[in-house]
UniProtKB/Swiss-Prot annotation:
Belongs to the universal ribosomal protein uS9 family. The lineage of its organism: Bacteria, Pseudomonadati, Pseudomonadota, Betaproteobacteria, Burkholderiales. Gene3D superfamilies: 3.30.230.10. It comes from Ralstonia nicotianae (strain ATCC BAA-1114 / GMI1000). One of its GO terms (biological process) is translation. Pfam families: Ribosomal_S9. This is Small ribosomal subunit protein uS9. It comes from the Bacteria.
Amino acid sequence: MIGNWNYGTGRRKSAVARVFIKSGKGDIIVNGKPVADYFARETSLMMVRQPLELTNHGATFDIKVNVVGGGETGQAGAVRHGITRALIDYDATLKPTLSKAGLVTRDAREVERKKVGLHKARRRKQFSKR
């Protein structure tokens, strides 16, 4: 805990989010913008708010997020993971609820690297019999 802020780091693909939460009225600020302005897609907004709605803390905390790297979906996943960790830092009794929903586990899937002699990671050149 930093001052009266609780902290959590979230990661997803190549995105990293640093999340700070404190008691407030439910404002979520991502990189200096309101969350609705920062994330254009409704699915990204739902993803970010998921841990708060699951624990019935939708309007309990003010959240400040710094997120870098990745695209919109990766950043939304990183913010969700960070909020989850910050909530656990605030109140450890929330961990079983969040864990049951699968929000505590870091999604370890990363982009597979491109291999030499192939078009992409797995896409081969077209085979010609003749």
